[in-house]
Amino acid sequence: MDNDYTTSTTTSRRPRFWGFFFILFPLVSFLMWTIGLIVLLGLWSTQDKWHTPSEPDPVYLSDMGAYTKGFFIPMCVITGVFYFLTFIMIRLARQWGWIYPTGRKVETYLGWFAALTGAAAASCLISLSIRDDVHHDNVHWKFTAAFVVLAFVSAASNIFEWLSATRYYPQSSLLRVSFIFKFVIIVVGIICAIAFGGLHHNYRGRSARFEWVVCFLWSIYICLLCLDLAPALFYDSLASAPDLEKGAYATSVPESYVAPMEPPAAVLPDGEERYATPDLVPDTTAQYPYASATEPGVSNIPETRPERPVVYNMDVSQTTTTTRPVLA
């Protein structure tokens, strides 16, 4: 296994402030995008819904952005920049061991590819907000299509990276929940994006609804990125947490690892005992006088033993035989 993380177990504890700093990036992106969508929907609803026979019901988000560029452009800029920085923070946090340390080289490649495509998606989001569909209709929808594709590619890279991480952290319920929800969101989002593009010319009202659904699904996905960086907040309980056991302080050995106990002594057929380590050998000097108490395993039996006496020319006649009486 290719390890990108150190195996030192003496890493000092990090301050809680840095955990909030990391999670701040996806949180700002999520709040800015979600609040912006709600504000634009509220403006459309309070302004008589801009409902005319030629406009879809509800109106396209792009149309709302074209008439509220003073709000729509900062909304897209803040969302896009912090969305890109979120992937940078995730990759750095994994390399530094603040969250799940990297287990394979492919995770590093997927993480940086997600950051690269996230930067491209953020650029397209900012560009489509500037080139609105009222004055630059063709260019605007090209940027919109590029943004949707790049955002899904970035999300797919992040999902595959998390899928690879679940192999080394199967005990992490947080990691597993994040992966499952992201996978469901990206599948539903792709279906809605296809419906949005397919209904754009003939059924504009339905197409606009799918556009709003895709936007809110992307908002939920950004919220899940906050969940990915949440372990950085719990540095005190990280070593003993059951779902982050392996990656506590950038170590490859779980902090709760307990060495196995020595196996019990095995009883041999001749009655002797064989112990796994010399430290477990009991003091049997009194029972076995030839055993050494200071050096286990060393015998004090003399090298030359006295020979047994041998009797030659035994006179069989000297032996006596006792006859037991036979009862009649």
Swiss-Prot record:
Alphabetized UniProt keyword annotations: Cell membrane, Lipid biosynthesis, Lipid metabolism, Membrane, Transmembrane, Transmembrane helix
Any single GO CC term annotated in Swiss-Prot or TrEMBL for this entry: plasma membrane
Subcellular localization, as worded in the UniProt entry: Cell membrane
Side Cytoplasmic, residues: 1-19, 91-109, 164-178, 235-328
Recorded topology in the membrane: Multi-pass membrane protein
Superkingdom as given in the UniProt entry: Eukaryota
Residues spanning the membrane: 20-40, 70-90, 110-130, 143-163, 179-199, 214-234
Segments forming a coiled coil: none
Extracellular side: 41-69, 131-142, 200-213
Keyword Lipid biosynthesis: yes
InterPro entries: DRAM/TMEM150_Autophagy_Mod, Frag1/DRAM/Sfk1
Keyword Aminoacyl-tRNA synthetase in annotation: no
One of the protein's GO biological processes: lipid metabolic process
Similarity comment text for this entry: Belongs to the SFK1 family.
Function text: May control the production of phosphatidylinositol 4-phosphate (PI4P).
Protein name: Protein sfk1
Gene encoding the protein: sfk1
